[in-house]
C-alpha cells in the first residue's frame, strides 16, 4: 500500500487552526496542482459535528471558489477536523489562509439558510444532515483562535 502524506504527519505537533501545503503535483505538461490541509480544529482534541461540517463544506465550495483562482475542490477530512483544498497553481499558504478567514467571516456574519447551496433531496446526497447554526458557531470559534499560515508556529493572518 502506498504511503499517504497526511498519515505520516505527526498530529501531536500541529497547532490548529492553520493552512498547510501538503504537496504540489506537476503534470506532464508542467501544470501544477497544490493540495492544502485546512485544519480548523486541533486533531484528537475536537471534531466538527457532521451537520456543521457538511454545511461549511457546501459554503466553502462557493466562497473559496470566489476567492482563490484555480479552485478545484475542497473536501472534508474523515476525522472531521478540516478539509483538503485542491487548486491549480501554487498559491501561498498566506493567501489561502486569508481566503479561508474571509470565507469563515462571511459564514459567521452574513450567510442565511437560503444562501446555503445544495440542501435539497435533488442537490445533495445527505440533505437532511446540515446545520447552519453549527457552521456559524464553529466559524466563530475558529476565527477567535485565528488562522495561521504555519502548522507548527502560530502565525495568524490578518
Curated annotation (Swiss-Prot):
Binds 1 Fe cation per subunit. One of its GO terms (biological process) is quorum sensing. One of its GO terms (molecular function) is iron ion binding. Belongs to the LuxS family. Transmembrane segments: none annotated. Fe cation binds at residues 54, 58, 124. Homodimer. This is S-ribosylhomocysteine lyase. Keywords: Autoinducer synthesis, Iron, Lyase, Metal-binding, Quorum sensing. Involved in the synthesis of autoinducer 2 (AI-2) which is secreted by bacteria and is used to communicate both the cell density and the metabolic potential of the environment. The regulation of gene expression in response to changes in cell density is called quorum sensing. Catalyzes the transformation of S-ribosylhomocysteine (RHC) to homocysteine (HC) and 4,5-dihydroxy-2,3-pentadione (DPD). Its cofactor is Fe cation. Its EC number is 4.4.1.21. The keyword Lyase applies. It catalyses: S-(5-deoxy-D-ribos-5-yl)-L-homocysteine = (S)-4,5-dihydroxypentane-2,3-dione + L-homocysteine.
Amino acid at each position: 500500500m502506498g504511503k499517504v502524506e497526511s498519515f505520516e504527519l505527526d498530529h501531536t505537533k500541529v497547532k490548529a487552526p492553520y493552512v498547510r501545503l501538503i504537496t504540489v503535483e506537476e503534470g506532464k505538461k508542467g501544470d501544477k496542482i497544490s493540495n492544502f490541509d485546512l485544519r480548523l480544529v486541533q486533531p484528537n482534541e475536537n471534531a466538527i459535528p457532521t451537520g456543521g461540517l457538511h454545511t461549511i463544506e457546501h459554503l466553502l465550495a462557493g466562497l473559496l471558489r470566489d476567492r482563490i483562482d484555480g479552485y478545484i475542490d475542497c473536501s472534508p477530512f474523515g476525522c472531521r477536523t478540516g478539509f483538503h483544498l485542491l487548486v491549480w497553481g501554487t498559491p501561498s499558504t498566506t493567501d489561502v489562509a486569508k481566503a479561508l478567514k474571509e470565507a469563515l467571516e462571511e459564514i459567521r456574519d452574513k450567510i442565511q439558510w437560503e444562501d446555503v447551496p445544495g440542501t435539497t433531496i435533488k442537490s445533495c446526497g445527505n440533505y437532511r444532515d446540515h446545520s447552519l447554526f453549527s457552521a456559524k458557531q464553529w466559524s466563530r470559534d475558529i476565527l477567535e483562535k485565528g488562522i495561521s499560515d504555519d502548522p507548527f508556529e502560530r502565525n495568524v493572518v490578518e
